[in-house]
Amino acid sequence: SVFWTMAVLCAIAVVAVQVFTKESTATETPRMDWAGVLPLAVALGCVLTAFNEAGKLAEANWFLVIILLLIGAAGFWAFWNVEKKVADPLVPVAYLKQRRTWALLSTTLLTMTGVFAVMNGLIPNLGQDTDAGAGISASTISWVTLTPYALAGLVFGPIAGWMASKMGYKYVLQTGLIGTVVGLIISIFVVGAPNAWTLLFVSIFLGVTYAGIANIMLNGLGIVLSPADNQGYLPGMNAGAFN
């Protein structure tokens, strides 16, 4: 039933986009850089697989991890050199060197890695643990953690956007990041004696500070910081960093 509900909502979204939105494209629409896509896909695939294998720790095949990382590095090197030569690169090398690219992508990657691990892994698992946790059932835990987190972000997102228009993206982003750190510190103390109310508080707190503020600002900056001649590269790479 959950999957059918998701399918119905997706179908409604498809119809809504078709009916209520207008198509938009960049001023220039060059051909797809397939020569750059291939080495980039190989590089990212190998690096992600290497990290997944390394996550097994004692049971990990470290030889495989090293090989995958080497292949990934070779893929990135090939991608870099391809982008310097093709007429319409997927990502111009000049943009790859700029601070607006790496500052945004590294912030997105690092914050998402931490918050995702806490909110999608540690908090729900702690809530369900009957020995060290709150002993909440699997059918209830999402209502205490993930749902409030998502709803808090949904409600506060428009507020964060309004704040950014008045105070600036940088200030609001920094506020969200500081708040996220505070929320994670609070989580450390919650671990000692978790219950439904403390987990709910942490979930809502992080929902506001990260999902509602920091996440929204990072998405917005992906658009604001994009150069006029290549408006799609930074939002696309930022989406990859989120994933």
Q: Over which residues does each language-model region extend?
A:
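Hydrophobic transmembrane-helix bundles of small-molecule transporters
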Residues: V2-T107, G114
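12-transmembrane solute porter fold
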Residues: F63, D88-N243
